């Protein structure tokens, strides 16, 4: 029997606010245990939560960016369950009346565009953290308690592990473009749970689903879904039944293992939080937040193609990350040359980032200095070959390209007299190659150019070298005739 994979994703996105969702405590990562806490975080008697407005703004921005309807009235609810790192005994979340409803993400997993529908986006707070690796005891760190999250829940529209990965990457791109999260899966800023089921191909009814947790990279999401899908098939074909449960992905053993029975919404006994008023969203707020939305990748890529006359593929690469796109545009502003800026950013800059495994924010060459370097090439001050040497030195030294060119004596030689002398020396030293050229084997012209550039240590203006070489070699051909 042929089976169809059905996947829905629940993604928790940690917001990069300075303070927590319902108190003024810092969200700074890596602080000593239980230092970013207050009576609200610790659920001390009488402590009352106050909603962070920035959390509401970020939720609405994400909702707008994914085509959701923004609720004019939404409610914060208590999700009741017991866990040692949940001080209050409940988590503040949203249930029946979330802030964003019915959106969509368009993805391309290699087989064309597909729309993955969103059920909802809602606000909630993170729990604390249990620490098990200190002796035989378990300790609680409440620093993370109350850190703001947005939960993004998709419909079960995903049909392959590749689509699941593409969906997550698209969502990560959006939250990074919005500037509401760093979207780092490895550090837990973007956490994904996958609901997986199988059904006979052609059937409309869904099979029993299992939930997979503990996936901290796009690749682990793919592998976990593929493993779980095959496990379902093996159980079904052996005549067994799938148990609805939560399973953990083991990245070392490349398998899932049972964690607990799957909870249902009624298990959490949701009810409106009496300490928090409902969230009211009016047209003025929507207008304000709509104006704060950035230009998104698809629109920005189309503009790059039109405005800078670069290929669609290049525009797609340059706009994949907002910081790269910003860097490129600033380089264009300084250099005035979109094509050259595209070539340098896509070539030398991205190569360097990949080799050093660093983000563009840590790159030592500013877009202004890269723009100056491109300008020196355009003016004929240096050649492309020398420019790459200058580029490498700019990474080592805190100096601009003009200063490096001056100090190192790298300025391009365009003096026809000096170049003509070298050209004549090369011609005189290679009579056999001259004869080949003059007998019609003009492809050997590149040999002469290379010899001239080598003799002048790459500083000669290639255009001037080409002109003088061609003139001298062609003169000989005319004379023989």
Curated annotation (Swiss-Prot):
Pfam families cross-referenced by the UniProt entry: GatB_N (PF02934), GatB_Yqey (PF02637)
Reactions listed under catalytic activity: L-glutamyl-tRNA(Gln) + L-glutamine + ATP + H2O = L-glutaminyl-tRNA(Gln) + L-glutamate + ADP + phosphate + H(+); L-aspartyl-tRNA(Asn) + L-glutamine + ATP + H2O = L-asparaginyl-tRNA(Asn) + L-glutamate + ADP + phosphate + 2 H(+)
Record keywords: ATP-binding, Ligase, Nucleotide-binding, Protein biosynthesis
Leader sequence segment: none
Enzyme Commission identifier(s): 6.3.5.-
Broadest EC class assigned to this enzyme: ligase
Entries under InterPro entries matching the protein: Asn/Gln-tRNA_amidoTrfase_suB/E, Asn/Gln-tRNA_Trfase_suB/E_cat, Asn/Gln_amidotransferase, Asn/Gln_tRNA_amidoTrase-B-like, GatB, GatB_C_1, GatB_Yqey_C_2, Gln_synth/guanido_kin_cat_dom
GO terms of biological process kind: glutaminyl-tRNAGln biosynthesis via transamidation; translation
Gene Ontology molecular functions: asparaginyl-tRNA synthase (glutamine-hydrolyzing) activity; ATP binding; glutaminyl-tRNA synthase (glutamine-hydrolyzing) activity
Protein family according to the UniProt entry: Belongs to the GatB/GatE family. GatB subfamily.
Subunit structure comment from the entry: Heterotrimer of A, B and C subunits.
Function description: Allows the formation of correctly charged Asn-tRNA(Asn) or Gln-tRNA(Gln) through the transamidation of misacylated Asp-tRNA(Asn) or Glu-tRNA(Gln) in organisms which lack either or both of asparaginyl-tRNA or glutaminyl-tRNA synthetases. The reaction takes place in the presence of glutamine and ATP through an activated phospho-Asp-tRNA(Asn) or phospho-Glu-tRNA(Gln).
Record's protein name: Aspartyl/glutamyl-tRNA(Asn/Gln) amidotransferase subunit B
Organism, scientific name: Prosthecochloris aestuarii (strain DSM 271 / SK 413)
Lineage: Bacteria, Pseudomonadati, Chlorobiota, Chlorobiia, Chlorobiales
Gene designation: gatB
């Amino acid at each position: 029997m042929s089976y169809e994979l059905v996947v829905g994703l629940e993604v928790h996105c940690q917001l990069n606010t300075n303070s927590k969702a319902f108190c003024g405590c810092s969200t700074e990562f890596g602080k000593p245990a239980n230092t970013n806490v207050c009576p609200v975080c610790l659920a001390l008697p009488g402590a009352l939560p106050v909603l962070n407005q920035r959390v509401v703004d970020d939720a609405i921005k994400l909702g707008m960016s994914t085509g959701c309807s923004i609720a004019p009235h939404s409610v914060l609810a208590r999700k009741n369950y017991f866990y040692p790192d949940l001080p209050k005994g409940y988590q503040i979340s949203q249930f029946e009346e979330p802030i964003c409803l019915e959106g969509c993400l368009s993805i391309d997993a290699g087989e064309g565009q597909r729309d993955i529908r969103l059920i909802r986006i809602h606000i909630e707070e993170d729990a604390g953290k249990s620490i098990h690796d200190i002796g035989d005891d378990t300790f609680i760190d409440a620093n993370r308690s109350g850190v703001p999250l947005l939960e993004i829940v998709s419909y079960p529209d995903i049909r392959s592990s590749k689509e699941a990965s593409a969906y997550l990457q698209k969502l990560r791109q959006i939250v990074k473009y919005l500037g509401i999260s760093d979207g780092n899966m490895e550090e837990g800023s973007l956490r994904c749970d996958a609901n997986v089921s199988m059904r006979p191909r052609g059937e409309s009814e869904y099979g029993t689903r299992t939930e997979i947790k503990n996936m901290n990279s796009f690749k682990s999401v793919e592998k976990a879904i593929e493993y779980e899908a095959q496990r379902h098939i093996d159980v079904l074909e052996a005549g067994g039944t799938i148990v609805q449960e939560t399973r953990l992905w083991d990245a070392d053993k490349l398998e899932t293992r049972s964690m607990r029975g799957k909870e249902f919404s009624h298990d959490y006994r949701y009810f409106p939080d009496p300490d928090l008023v409902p969230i009211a969203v009016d047209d003025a707020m929507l207008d304000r937040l709509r104006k704060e939305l950035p230009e998104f990748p698809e629109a920005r890529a189309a503009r790059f193609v039109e405005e800078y006359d670069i290929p669609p593929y290049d525009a797609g690469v340059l706009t994949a990350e907002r910081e790269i796109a910003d860097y490129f545009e600033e380089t264009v502003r300084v250099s005035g040359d979109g094509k050259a800026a595209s070539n340098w950013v896509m070539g030398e800059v991205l190569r360097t980032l990949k080799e050093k495994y660093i983000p563009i924010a840590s790159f030592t060459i500013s877009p202004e200095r890269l723009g100056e370097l491109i300008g020196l090439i355009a003016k004929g001050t240096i050649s492309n070959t020398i420019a790459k040497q200058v580029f490498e030195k700019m990474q080592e030294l805190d100096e601009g390209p003009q200063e490096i060119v001056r100090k190192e004596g790298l300025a391009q030689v365009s003096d026809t007299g000096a170049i003509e002398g070298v050209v004549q020396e090369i011609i005189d030293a290679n009579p056999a190659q001259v004869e080949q050229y003059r007998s019609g084997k003009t492809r050997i012209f590149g040999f002469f150019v290379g010899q001239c550039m080598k003799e002048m240590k790459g500083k000669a203006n290639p255009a001037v070298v080409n002109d003088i070489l061609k003139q001298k070699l062609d003169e000989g051909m005319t004379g023989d005739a």
